[in-house]
Amino acid sequence: MATFKDACYHYKKLNKLNSLVLKLGANDEWRPAPVTKYKGWCLDCCQYTNLTYCRGCALYHVCQWCSQYNRCFLDEEPHLLRMRTFKDVITKEDIEGLLTMYEILFPINEKLVNKFINSVKQRKCRTEYLLEWYNHLLMPITLQALTIKLEDSTYYIFGYYDCMEHENQTPFQFINLLEKYDKLLLDDRNFNRMLHLPTILQQEYALRYFSKSRFLSKGKKRLNRNDFSDNLVEDRHSPTSLIQVVRNCISTHPNDYEWNKACTFVVDARNYINIMNSSYTEHYSVSQRCKLFTKYKFGIISKLVKPNYIFSSHESCALNVHNCRWCQINSHYKVWEDFRLKKIYNNVMDFIRALVKSNGNVGQCSSQESVYKCIPDIFLICKMEKWNEAVEVLFNYLEPVDINGTEYVLLDYEVNWEVRGLVMQSMDGKVPRILNINDTKKILSTIIFDWFDVRYMRETPMTTSTTNQLRTLNKRNELIDEYDLELSDVE
């Protein structure tokens, strides 16, 4: 029983404006849709159901029925989902605009209530006020919203969401924004609406209103790699392939600074209809490059590391070792399809082996060493505290020598030409024979930053940018990277 969906279905018959604004895929004929993956609330129709991915942002936030309209909360076109989406910072004036929009689209008055009651009573056995027949009249106006933080912006998608107690497998979390408004004013609005309902329906309306307006907000969730779909990637077998997104736009291109004003468009019905008549779609191909995806990839590598290689005498690089039970790595994982990760893994292991061999550690593949525990963490460059600790453990294991208050280790073992070049790049064109802890960190970070410079990466993929941001980046030709040409960050 999705109250918001039912309200849209019945209220869209009132007038021309409502028929345009309240048209939901969930109320239309079902069309073939992508398979669902997560349980949660569809942002478009607010029902709790199985969700599929959005073609505008790659997040799972739309049901199979609503997916046919390709609406995203980051769109530019002021459809109902976009008008219910607000960005920080929300003012009392912004909330007034939202409440006014609700009053325009979902009015409750004596004439309208009688019209709905008469419509229900036309059918036999419907003289009672059963809740399922009048569900559309039982949607209170609340400041209940689902929230998500993307980069530096926090988005709030207002609506009436049933079944709040159910399991939520999406990164969106419930928040109560009643504190941004006057509690008594909101109560008064709803009591005035409730007065026009029969007594039995008044009781249910009041119960729903207080349950959805007095709840405690939940803590915000952190995004992870699995929150984004791979279905929008051009070539899922290519790690550098672009993500295809579609955004709904309008010809006037409103500024992002006026994001929270979208809900005011419905005040002037004629102007709103003209705006919607100018709508069109824009298609963008964006890079997968971001910290979230990078952290996920390095997390996999840290679990596949074969630290025994740093004591070995294999002539081949770390990933090309065969017929050695201690050093041979499983190269069938999808992560190794990325040539950048291959280079990083080989070069990091080559450099660490050079340090170990240079400082008198005579071991072999099969030896069990305490230093092995820290090697996987050296690939977790996105977790700097953990990474620094791992490098320090490695450095101390090499038994550094104190020279004038600074500890040094040797570097006189042969490294491959690529590592040599990266050492020279980070050490002002020289290959030093001794290294302190800062030099060691600098070289190891340079090897990784050569392809994944996380210092200058976005936290989330560009699919979470607003339409205006995508348009601006596209004009600067900054939506894609040059990894397909095997050009590194440095190059």
Swiss-Prot record:
Pfam families reported for this sequence: Rota_NS53
Subcellular localization: Host cytoplasm, Host cytoskeleton
Keyword terms of this UniProt record: Host cytoplasm, Host cytoskeleton, Host-virus interaction, Inhibition of host innate immune response by virus, Inhibition of host IRF3 by virus, Inhibition of host IRF7 by virus, Inhibition of host RLR pathway by virus, Interferon antiviral system evasion, Metal-binding, RNA-binding, Viral immunoevasion
Region annotated RNA-binding, chain positions: 1-81
GO MF, one example: metal ion binding
Family, similarity comment: Belongs to the rotavirus NSP1 family.
Domain-level remarks: The integrity of the zinc-binding domain in NSP1 is important for degradation of host IRF3.
Subunit structure as annotated in this protein's UniProt entry: Interacts (via C-terminus) with host IRF3; this interaction leads to IRF3 degradation. Interacts with host IRF7; this interaction leads to IRF7 degradation. Interacts with host CUL1 and CUL3.
Protein name, entry field: Non-structural protein 1
Organism expressing this protein natively: Rotavirus A (strain RVA/Cow/United Kingdom/UK/1975/G6P7[5]) (RV-A)
Lineage: Viruses, Riboviria, Orthornavirae, Duplornaviricota, Resentoviricetes
